[in-house]
Amino acid sequence: MTEVQEEKDYKLAIEAFNLVYNALDKKAREKFRSRARDMVEEIYTSGFIPTLFYIISKAGLENNNDKLTALLNSPSSKSIDLGSSDEASYMAYLFVILYYLSERNIINKEFLINKLKNNRLELIDKLYELSPIISARIKRYLMAIKRLAEALIEVR
């Protein structure tokens, strides 16, 4: 990976973290911090797709899909309230992953949002197809998210 790509990953991590930080209340931020610490390791232990399935199952998309798509569509200045539940922290971590994939043009944002709303199975199939590329490229970004969460989110 080139130095320019690394810088882009760090910049994206800061942008995504800022959006997530502003979308969660204090309790959910603490939970997100745990997700950021655990999920990056889980992706490289269990694999991207099994971990993604787990995150999706915990994110409560059946009830909160509109919040996730709104966050993906929002400019960085607009705040979306994801809430304070465990689901919110998983949804925030799912957002972090999907944000990277769309902003780095690994997957088209319009396709991503459309499939989140209308056909998640087709989206999962596409992510499965791209998983070798995703796994190879996303680690530095997720590590940056982890470090930001550890540095900026206090736990009681």
Curated annotation (Swiss-Prot):
Listed SUPFAM superfamilies: AF1862-like
InterPro entries xrefs: AF1862-like_dom_sf, CRISPR-assoc_prot_Cmr5
Q: Which UniProt keywords apply?
A: Antiviral defense, Cytoplasm
Residue spans making up a coiled coil are none
Q: Which family does it belong to?
A: Belongs to the CRISPR system Cmr5 family.
- What does the record list as GO biological process? defense response to virus
NCBIfam families the record matches: cas_Cmr5
Main localization is: cytoplasm
Source organism of the structure: Saccharolobus solfataricus (strain ATCC 35092 / DSM 1617 / JCM 11322 / P2) (Sulfolobus solfataricus)
Q: Does the keyword Cytoplasm apply?
A: yes
Task: Indicate yes or no for the key word Metal-binding.
Answer: no
What is the protein's name according to its record?
CRISPR system CMR subunit Cmr5
Report one GO cellular component. cytoplasm
Q: Any idea what job this protein has?
A: CRISPR (clustered regularly interspaced short palindromic repeat) is an adaptive immune system that provides protection against mobile genetic elements (viruses, transposable elements and conjugative plasmids). CRISPR clusters contain spacers, sequences complementary to antecedent mobile elements, and target invading nucleic acids. CRISPR clusters are transcribed and processed into CRISPR RNA (crRNA). The CMR complex degrades RNA complementary to the crRNA (target RNA) within UA dinucleotides, generating 3'-OH and 5'-phosphate ends.
Q: Where in the cell is it found?
A: Cytoplasm
Classify the source by domain of life. Archaea
Subunit and partners? Part of the CMR ribonucleoprotein complex, consisting of crRNA plus Cmr1/Cmr2/Cmr3/Cmr4/Cmr5/Cmr6 at 1:1 and possibly 3 Cmr7 dimers. A Cmr2/Cmr3/Cmr7 subcomplex without crRNA can also be isolated. It does not cleave target RNA.
CDD domains for the chain: Cmr5_III-B
